[in-house]
Amino acid sequence: MILDIEMLRSFYASYSESVAQAKATVKRPLTYAEKVLFAHLFDPTQLRPYKRGIEYVDFRPNRVAMQDATAQMALLQFMNAGKDKVAVPASVHCDHLIRADVGANIDLPEACKTNKEVYDFLKSVSQKYHIGFWGPGAGIIHQVVLENYAFPGGMMVGTDSHTPNAGGLGMVAVGVGGADAVDVLTGQPWELKMPRLIGVHLTGKLSGWATPKDVILEILGILTVKGGTNAILEYFGEGLDSISTTGKATICNMGAELGATCSIFPFDQNASEYLRKTGREEIASLAQQNAKELRADDEVLTNPSAFYDQIVEIDLSKVEPHLNGPFTPDAATPISHMKAKGPANDYPMVGEVGLVGSCTNSSYQDLARAASVARQAYEKGIEVKGQLIINPGSEQIRYTAERDGILDDFKKIGALIMTNACGPCIGQWKRHTEDNTRKNAIVTSFNRNFRRRADGNPNTFAFIGSPELTVALTIAGRLDFNPATDTLLDKEGNSVKLDAPTGFTFPPKGFAVEDKGFIAPSEENANVEVVIAPDSNRLQKLAPFAPWDGKDLVDMPLLIKTEGKCTTDHISMAGPWLKFRGHLQNISDNLLMGAVNAFNGESNKVKNQLDGNYVEVSTAAKAYKAQGISSIVVAEDNYGEGSSREHAAMEPRFLNVKVILAKSFARIHETNLKKQGMLALTFCNKDDYNKVQEDDRISLTGLKEFAPGSKLTVTLKHKDGSEDSFEVEHTYNDTQIAWFKAGSALNFAAKNK
């Protein structure tokens, strides 16, 4: 059975009472996000009005979801915890390791062959420890979770940054690193800084070519990629009624690009219908019984500014189709502005490839509406200029879409149907091009468009739009085509216009599938043996990191001073490196290879202070490690933006990098660094970043007095003999300092179990 029905019955039986107790304790009305948070305290007796954005709180999530690229490291850590089974319901989803090449029929068998060792490992660990296993081809983690596991009022963590997708069905769903997931899997408290609350007030109704994707693309332009850090975005207002559950999931999904802890929509009739249409009638009924507490209190809705830390106003009737990019998802541009903005910024204006899919936009409704645009091109005799690639969100969606003729609509205009997997969105794309370094443009319905992310080409200008707009621009072959106003030529030379997209929210004949690709947890598999070959280059058992030696860090060489955006893609690249996600030593060879060196403007080329030669970042780090020397990384704002991959924290730790000193951090990555026993420090004065020189030896003092709220001192010894000193700060609490001293959170847990 897929649903953990007894857990859900127990949860809903006590949920409303938990909320009532919370309101009585804090003595005020509650937002919906607060209700869910307070209902999931690890120790309900500790309930009090926590200081948002300041205090850390222990929670007890209902479940854990893991994708195959991050599950490897998470489960390798779990295996060291000495548990017989997971403490909460959990699932593994094989979606990241499948490469998009020529089509699903060939790509999926090839992936099963290439990744057999990893799939066998994940399957055996799942069976042994009572974890649900979704095999390759079953679908993208967040679409599968929405269809099968998400439930209003619940709390979930997932080892993927787009876990907040489930907020579309009313969950507090948070992306975390593997070590955080292990806390939940082993029944320990899960620690989170009490989020700030950003209320997003939706009025009006979407129309024409505007979609839910355009709502979040517009919000990204307002708040930027840092604007949601340590915050939950809670949506409210009469505009909610016109947005489907999958549309709401799209909006919550890309809240990750704001840096938000998560995003959430209240339970409503659309959510109830989605639960029923996906075979969860009992959950819909249980939620309906608790409906009053699955939304913000009336007093909050009447006077939202008194309860939210910030309010964003969005009139849906004024939302335009957007095309965000290139290179960052918050470069928001209404499509009507592209004719002027494109040439002014020297964008390549020919859209060569359109990619529809990803966890953000691969629902039945997404495909149905996008197919309505493709169908027009075929029926109106319009020659399609670009290449179109489709990744369905799950096998249930693919099977149903094929039955209903949706996939045929795409195929008729030459589209390639790829596997139900992430594919190009995570860099798993064998792009067929003669020159993968040339300047070009692609349009996607994905969530991220960092340089090199999709195809490895630093000169690919990637833009993000809705599935409908992606198909329209692929048909036109131009980034400045506005389907609301512009016309195209048919094969006879006549001007024709594309009508606004249409499509069913749910399949008229219902969802259908022959094989979901799921293996349910079973007590019968407890004796399954988990084997890791000692000579494997894909999997490697983990050795504990060394504890702190009690000394200050003196004369550390600067490994790299990064310039500009440094995401987890820059720190630990995906694409071809995904195959090493279960082997820490091998994947560490990609450390910071995408980061730009502030001293030469180049990537993966830094000075090795031992011999003065310029080498790859990992080569320099390994040279220092071999000599027993700790090193330090210096960075700018929002370091670690993007994916939840904890490899971006484990790799520097493995290569003896002890400190990341940045202007600011992205939430998930800062936590991951702390979990691995590293020091994530920030400049008190951001201008001190400019004092760091290439040949500096850097000391960090004050560690013996390391305490919550304390300052540490950095001293730079420059090559000319001069020095600079300045204070740095941190956000560590007592527990996190204990992790540092123990060498990692896992070491601390093992020592204190």
Task: Identify the role of each PLM range.
Residues 47, 147, 151, 243-249, ...:
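Short glycine/threonine-rich loop-to-helix capping motif typified by GTGT followed
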Residues 76-80, 306-401, 405, 524-659:
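Non-catalytic terminal/interface segments that mediate subunit docking, oligomerization
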Residues 3-4, 68, 151-284, 416, ...:
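Mobile "lid/hinge" segments at catalytic clefts and subdomain interfaces of large enzymes
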Residues 8-11, 15, 20-195, 581-633, ...:
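Long, structured ligand/cofactor-binding scaffold of large enzymes
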Residues 488-505, 670-739, 746-749:
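Acidic, glycine-rich flexible loop/linker segments
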Residues 379-429, 643, 649, 662-681, ...:
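Extended C-terminal subregions enriched in glycine
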Residues 42, 46, 51-60, 74, ...:
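Terminal amphipathic helices with adjacent charged low-complexity linkers/tails
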